[in-house]
Amino acid sequence: MKKKKIGLLVMAYGTPESLEDVEAYYTHIRHGRKPSEEALQDLIGRYKAIGGISPLAKITKEQAHKLTDSMNNMFTEYEFNCYLGLKHTAPFIEDAVEEMKRDGIEQAISIVLAPHYSTFSIKAYNERAIRLSEEIGGPVIEPIDQWYDEPKFISYWADQIKETFTKIEDKEKAVVIFSAHSLPEKIIAAGDPYVEQLQHTADLIAAAANIQNYTIGWQSAGNTSDPWIGPDVQDLTRELFEEHRYEAFIYCPVGFVAEHLEVLYDNDYECKVVTDELNAAYFRPNMPNAQSTFIDCLATIVSKKMKEIVDKELILNNN
């Protein structure tokens, strides 16, 4: 019996794969407006500071393909096909949807490599994919909207924090800062759950890791006239030091799932500059990347959606 094909649309932000690609990437983020030479060189300088280019492209591809392999191992009666769709670099989300259509995929599951729902992120990604799929007559896309409280995701970070605390002598003098990418404040007024979801993630991880000293912060805010959600992690570090005299700061950028510019520069460089100024210790646990525990977490999330689809088909077939 021929296996039914299921498209697995894995979506992410995207990143330039070489310094020569930075200008086109930056221009796409700015909706087609080229950045100033000063802004462009500033961004290129950040990439050079982390070794020349971000490892994100390689990690994202590895995450997508390993997740697809896991799904094929879990659901042997189906054939999952991997399609990578990126927001700001090729292959774009639309490229992936068109490829699924050409391949004869009639049904797909989409997952965004970001745990917290926002109109700026997960909603926007899924809307782009579904809008085009409806325009071209398929495939039918079943989106996963959020997974910020997935137990295996919580366990991953709790384990990382526990391991980090083994390196800290005075645990009462240490604090964990859970962070995500800042977004414009206007999303809060519109009822976006992004902030509440980050807080919930932090609370769940803190409980699982049995820590009391923790808070949430925001990082990597855009340079626009609109106010962005705060406090920024660097300002927060200084405030926490002034108030509590913490001697160790543990940064957990749980809004991200891989090492990339925002982690390797904004955390590992900029936040460390602050902790060095304060004569405090800097720690940043390992990111999930394509570790087997995290791939298993993603597979669990996708399998829940797949089981919903299978159950729905059984109901339809029995009626």
Swiss-Prot record:
Involved pathway(s): Porphyrin-containing compound metabolism; protoheme biosynthesis
The species this protein was found in: Bacillus cereus (strain ZK / E33L)
Residues binding Fe-coproporphyrin III: Y13, R30, R46, Y47, S54, Y125
Keyword terms, alphabetized: Cytoplasm, Heme biosynthesis, Iron, Lyase, Metal-binding, Porphyrin biosynthesis
SUPFAM superfamilies recorded: Chelatase
Cell location: Cytoplasm
Enzyme class: lyase
Protein name as catalogued: Coproporphyrin III ferrochelatase 2
InterPro entries: Ferrochelatase (IPR001015), Ferrochelatase_AS (IPR019772), Ferrochelatase_C (IPR033644), Ferrochelatase_N (IPR033659)
Any GO MF annotation of the entry: metal ion binding
Domain of life of the organism encoding this protein: Bacteria
E.C. designation(s): 4.99.1.9
Reactions catalysed according to its record: Fe-coproporphyrin III + 2 H(+) = coproporphyrin III + Fe(2+)
Gene Ontology biological process terms, A to Z: heme biosynthetic process
NCBIfam families, per database record: hemH, PRK12435.1
GO cellular component, one term: cytoplasm
Protein family per UniProt: Belongs to the ferrochelatase family.
Binding site for Fe(2+): H181, E262
Function noted in UniProt: Involved in coproporphyrin-dependent heme b biosynthesis. Catalyzes the insertion of ferrous iron into coproporphyrin III to form Fe-coproporphyrin III.
Pfam families: Ferrochelatase
Matching PANTHER family: FERROCHELATASE (PTHR11108), FERROCHELATASE, MITOCHONDRIAL (PTHR11108:SF1)
Signal peptide, first to last residue: none
HAMAP family xrefs: Ferrochelatase
Keyword Transcription: no
